[in-house]
Amino acid sequence: MRKYQARIISIILAMIFIMFWDYLFYFIGKNPINWPVDIVYTAVTLVSVWMLAYYIDEKQQLVKKMKDNEWKYKQLSEEKNRIMDNLQEIVFQTNAKGEITYLNQAWASITGFSISECMGTMYNDYFIKEKHVADHINTQIQNKASSGMFTAKYVTKNGTIFWGEVHYKLYYDRDDQFTGSLGTMSDITERKEAEDELIEINERLARESQKLSITSELAAGIAHEVRNPLTSVSGFLQIMKTQYPDRKDYFDIIFSEIKRIDLVLSELLLLAKPQAITFKTHQLNEILKQVTTLLDTNAILSNIVIEKNFKETDGCMINGDENQLKQVFINIIKNGIEAMPKGGVVTISTAKTASHAVISVKDEGNGMPQEKLKQIGKPFYSTKEKGTGLGLPICLRILKEHDGELKIESEAGKGSVFQVVLPLKSDS
């Protein structure tokens, strides 16, 4: 009914006016009734009033629609601003000159500049103008590109520099003239620092790998060159030993040291020039039993008891080179035995996870302080007086080739635990 309100009211008022006029003209004025003129006059008046009222109704409806649309637009605008202000990314808009025309609240949070002080300023005033960035933007506009991305260093209000990744859209008019841009910017400082750190680590590893390769070649050459004359010296000393029986003790010391030098050279060659690995499937417990049987005599002579508990890995199969894996376990168990010169217990136990076997070797020795623990595994570093410092580096290399790892827990005065972690053979 509201859309006909003006017409209804106008017609009622017009009818009242006509009736009042007729009353004055015919009854009060005593004029004769002229029906044709009266009917035409009444009809023209009602139609005119109806048309005028129709225009008023339409205008009122149009005004109402405009107010409704204005209210809806205001609601949408407020909703859009709420959404934009809750975004973690900066949203910006610029005109053809590059002046900022819109910013969301994230701009203030990230850069420290208030939105009001930045409106109308040049967007590129807030990042470091590197040539590749400027060239990229100019090329995009010249090529009429619709969108793109670049990274740049931004400067906050307090002078802090951070990395920003910008994704933008470019807009043009009908004449292909640039009219402005709309985009988002994310703070990628942590990601950029991680990428730079990864690049630096890779470069450092590449340099170290090259150094190790050269060092390995050099070590292998030195080992061969030393071993050859050492063999000759040993042979001549054997002859001299028979000629000087009263100097037997001296010769025994010399031969003991030659044997030690030969052991160091052997381990150095093994570390520098590893042999080809033959991977086969083996029962883990069988390898451990063979190693402990081999070392039982050595342990007894050192007043050491070897306690074994392999139940957790019964039937567990691993892929690897049997001899190299035995070498790992022999080195680690011997370290445990040598860590207790006054005797004690070496405990060897196993456990397994869904994908790995864990072999633990625990001794009751003096343990190691943290500063020494950090050095363990470096070539020629040994905590033992007569150690070569090559046993653990060899173990680490072998385990790496078997996709395994070595974990060491030690505390001064409380002994050490060496854990060998090896992948189990897949059932597939």
From Swiss-Prot:
Q: GO CC annotation: what is one? A: membrane raft
Q: Is Nucleotide-binding one of the keywords?
A: yes
Keyword entries, A-Z: ATP-binding, Cell membrane, Kinase, Membrane, Nucleotide-binding, Phosphoprotein, Sporulation, Transferase, Transmembrane, Transmembrane helix, Two-component regulatory system
In this chain the PAC domain maps to 148-200
Q: What is its EC number?
A: 2.7.13.3
Q: Name one Pfam family in it.
A: HisKA
Q: Does the keyword Iron apply?
A: no
Q: Which residues cross the membrane?
A: 8-28, 36-56
- Induction of synthesis: Induced at the onset of sporulation, shuts off at T3. May be under the control of Spo0A.
Q: Which InterPro entries match?
A: HATPase_C_sf, His_kinase_dom, HisK_dim/P_dom, HisK_dim/P_sf, PAC, PAS, PAS-assoc_C, PAS-like_dom_sf
Quote the disruption phenotype from the UniProt entry. Answer: No observable effect on sporulation. Forms a weak or no biofilm, wild-type sporulation.
Q: Which residues carry this modification: Phosphohistidine?
A: H224
The GO terms describing molecular function are: ATP binding; phosphorelay sensor kinase activity
Q: What is the membrane topology listed in the Swiss-Prot or TrEMBL record?
A: Multi-pass membrane protein
**Major localization class:** membrane
Domain Histidine kinase, first and last residues per copy: 221-426
Gene3D superfamilies per the record? Answer: 1.10.287.130, Histidine kinase-like ATPase, C-terminal domain (3.30.565.10), PAS domain (3.30.450.20)
Q: Where is the PAS domain?
A: 76-147
Q: Name one GO biological process term.
A: regulation of DNA-templated transcription
Q: Which reaction does it catalyse?
A: ATP + protein L-histidine = ADP + protein N-phospho-L-histidine
Q: Where in the cell is it found?
A: Cell membrane; Membrane raft
Q: How does it assemble?
A: Oligomerizes, probably forms homodimers; oligomerization is assisted by FloT. Interacts with FloT. Another study shows only rare colocalization with FloT or FloA membrane assemblies. KinC membrane assemblies are more mobile than FloT membrane assemblies.
Q: What is this protein called?
A: Sporulation kinase C
Species of origin reads Bacillus subtilis (strain 168)
